[in-house]
Amino acid sequence: MELNKVDDETEEITISTHKKSKQEIKKEREELTVKLETMSLENYISDNISLYCGDCIVEMQKIPDDSVDLILCDLPYGTTKCKWDTVIDLNELWKHYRRIIKKPSGVILLFGQQPFTSMLVSSNYEWFKYNLIWKKNKTTQFLLANYRPMKCTEDICVFSKGGAAAASRNTGNMTYNPQGLIPTNIKKKNSKERIGKMLNQEHHLGKNNKLISNSEYTQNFTNYPNELIEFDIEYDTIHETQKPVKLIEYLIKTYSNEGEVVLDNTMGSGTTGVGCVNTKRKFIGIEKEEKYFKLSKYRITNNL
């Protein structure tokens, strides 16, 4: 197995909250390569962690119906010629996603970039709720800078059978735990002029979902998140599309609860599994590329 190369230069780069030289990173990766060469490809099963090496369409058949609370996955976009970057049959994928996700509370989060984002949305428009936009601190595609804007964002498509509005509370909403809220106790009053026809807050509605005009309510929190989320990329990465642990933890905490089950059916280097361990969730991971399965297994089990 050959991991990504690092130049011999001694230029320092920021990794999380500390700095390492490229020589230090190179040495660490050489040591990791030796460890992974001797690691078994056997599936890893424990009370809270299940890791499978194989094709996700096949391996997901082992997952019981209505047993997964959150699916968080960075599917192959099909934008490169790399062996691992082959688009999975979305129809087959949704057959399993629909079967195994809990309803109505379960949430499915899929990373994407255009034109793959449009493919994802159209693959299950009925369940599509909205897009989050991850803004990075670094741009990519510099070689195309003279021909098009450089990229600094990725989409996160949010799907669920459940609702995402107060009007759907009788039929059940998807899990949503907004992060970063600031407590406040502000008295406010409803009015038809202020609210208009769009009702998306439960405290505006009374019996039969009718507007309670001129009624008072207390706003308990402020600083609600918007659709743009900003997380720095990690420079010391091994997989080509590895996501920051802090970003994954944010998504896990927003769309699931402690003790619940999270699935990543193309887990790559295992960042979702690491995030689940850090946030006290159970994790099911699937990866067909042997070198990345070993890496995921190493990262996750050494983080327990």
Language model features with spans:
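Cysteine-dependent PTP/DSP-like catalytic domain, specifically the C-terminal lobe
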Residues: 293-304
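Core catalytic lobe of class I
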Residues: 2-5, 9, 13-14, 18, ...
